[in-house]
Structures are given as structure tokens and as C-alpha cells.
Amino acid sequence: GLIVLGLVAAAFWGGASLDGVRPSLEIIAPAVDLSPPGAPLMLPFLFITIACGAISGFHCLVASGTTSKQVRNETDALPIGYGAMVTEGFLAVLVIFACVAGLGLGVTDASGEELTGVAAWSDRYASWGTAGGLGSKVAAFVDGASNLLAAMAIPPSVAIALMGVLVASFAGTTLD
């Protein structure tokens, strides 16, 4: 919970380093790219994306054996499912922000060169092929979110470790 609050603070205030110099935090992703090379059609994925929050809220309610045992009656399930859905949507917005603004603060490419701004975005998302695969998606989130935490004077190695633990925790709770 504290890590998520830190990401929210970094998103709204842009972080503040110990030396008083604030990093330039800007969204470097293009607003619209209607035809990325090699991308599948958007139509079926759009409905899956929109339904994901509602499904996750319902899944949070019924998939955990503890939640169903804690509600007094069926009407208590409505605010729990809705709250889980809203929380899931908020988390999705934080992840998007970390991947589009956090990457711009700097990433290291395969050759070891430090990239910032649009060059960092292009390194990760230049084509559908470079953005594909679970490893590149997790790396984009970990790098972007750790950059946001590093902007708040948290050492980069600690920020990367925290984000790695966060990703592992999400994976672990998903398997439950």
C-alpha cells in the first residue's frame, strides 16, 4: 500500500530530490498511433480491456474464500465488488502512468546506453514486436515506476527491488 501511495505522490508532484532539483516529468508517449506496425486489430481487445475492471471486482469478491465468509448478506457484496473494481481501475491508471511518464526519466538499452525522453519510449515501444512478450512489459513497468520512486530521492537500486517485489506480489496473489 505504501508503494502505491508513493507512486501516486510521484505522479502528482513529480518527486523532489534531496538537492532540491526536480526532475522533468512529462508524458513522452504519442497520444495516438492508429496503425502501429505489426499490431493486431484493436476491436476485440478494447472490450476485454473495458470489462477487465468489472471482472476483477467480481473475481476479488468470489475467488477469495475469505471475502465470501466475511459478508453478512448478499447486499454487502455490492460495495465490496464495486470498491474492488474501482481500485483495479486506479491501479491500471498508475501502471499506465509509470509506463508512459516514468520511462522518459531514463532507461538503459541492450547496449548499455542511457536513454531518456522519446528515445527511451522508442526503445521499448518502437514496434509491436519490441513491446511484445511478458518480459518487456514487466521491465517497462519496473523501470518506469522505479524512475518515479527515484525522483523522490529513493536510491534506484532500492526502487527497482521494491517494484520487483510488487510485481512478484501481484503474481503471487493472482495465483491464489
List the model feature ranges, each with a label.
Residues 4-7, 56, 87-95, 175:
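Alpha-helical transmembrane segments of multipass membrane proteins
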Residues 84-85, 99-103, 162-169:
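A glycine-rich phosphate-binding loop feature that marks nucleotide/adenosyl-phosphate handling sites
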Residues 83, 148-158:
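Transmembrane-helix boundary/entry motifs in multi-pass membrane transporters
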Residues 11-32, 86-143:
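Extracellular/periplasmic helix-exit of transmembrane alpha-helices
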Residues 1-56:
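Helix-loop-helix junctions that connect adjacent transmembrane segments
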Residues 52-71, 130-133, 137, 141, ...:
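Membrane-helix boundary/coupling elements in multi-pass transport proteins
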Residues 1, 58-92:
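Hydrophobic, small-residue-rich membrane helices and short re-entrant helix-turn-helix hairpins
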Residues 50-53, 81-88, 169:
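Transmembrane helix-bundle signature of multi-pass membrane transporters/permeases
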